[in-house]
């Protein structure tokens, strides 16, 4: 499983000229922006990774709806 700390460590390994704190701040900033965009029901498209959007779903046996995150992966994600 990839956690936020794992992601920070891997980015820091590749970009060792940045401090770990700078990498952490950058990852936090990106995740916060993605989170806020989804809260505002904006569609997120990251080329060669996938699309994220909000979909409304209905509770079973109820007239109430809830929001869920929908992910669509690109067709070439697992192609070699």
Curated annotation (Swiss-Prot):
Q: Does the keyword Iron-sulfur apply?
A: no
One Gene Ontology term, aspect cellular component = cytosol
Q: Name one GO molecular function term.
A: DNA binding
SMART domains attached to this UniProt entry: BHL
UniProt superkingdom:
Bacteria
Q: Which InterPro entries match?
A: Hist_DNA-bd, IHF-like_DNA-bd_dom_sf
GO biological process terms, semicolon-separated: chromosome condensation
Instruction: Decide whether keyword DNA-binding is in the record.
Output: yes
Q: Which chain positions lie within coiled-coil regions?
A: none
Disulfide bridge map: none
Q: Keyword set for this entry?
A: DNA condensation, DNA-binding
Q: Where are the transmembrane segments?
A: none
Annotated function: Histone-like DNA-binding protein which is capable of wrapping DNA to stabilize it, and thus to prevent its denaturation under extreme environmental conditions.
Name the family the entry cites: Belongs to the bacterial histone-like protein family.
Name this protein carries in UniProt: DNA-binding protein HU-like
